[in-house]
């Protein structure tokens, strides 16, 4: 993947999405389709954006019992997305089942990455709401190591943790870092963020 920039299509309709993508004259950015757009438009939005020549990260964060995730991943694999994800907290067994479901009969599959801790989560909320007392970066590293052990290609993590993840899992292990914001920009409900310039310097 290198250091691809993934553009979020955080819209509630196909019309808004295509109007946005039409602004990229002559370019076909790697795009993220999240829950809002996918639940509004269904698989057809994936097929149409793919038909337009874009690479797609389908960001649905699956988290369920292993067999349900396995069957769901088999469906997503047929959509020919380039990358999709799940929650690492679903256990190694769930992640292994996801790989099985995602792998096509010819042995190919989309890139599969695991969400470690959402960038809206901080130490306080992790301890009080999730009853996880370990330091957040330690939890992220543990989840990343589990994802690698289960055969996944990478993780979603804060840009603050990407360098440490590569130190543990190797430089080829994919890190997708959603918490990248301009210094004077609105960070919304994100807690663990970094500026684009700082993120660029992370290995």
Which role does the model predict for each range below?
Residues 2, 68-153, 161, 168-172, ...:
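Conserved anion-binding
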Residues 6, 32, 57, 82-85, ...:
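Conserved beta-strand positions in the central sheet of alpha/beta enzyme cores
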Residues 8-12, 34-38, 63-65, 89, ...:
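Active-site beta-loop-alpha junctions enriched in small/polar residues
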Residues 12-23, 67-75, 136-146, 191-198:
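Short, acidic/polar
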Residues 21-26, 44-53, 74-78, 100-106, ...:
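Acidic (Asp/Glu)-rich catalytic clusters
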Residues 30-83:
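Metabolite-binding pocket within alpha/beta catalytic cores that recognizes anionic/polar moieties
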Residues 43, 157-198:
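A C-terminal functional module that forms or caps the active site or interfaces directly
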Residues 200-203:
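Conserved small/polar residues in nucleotide/adenosyl-binding loops
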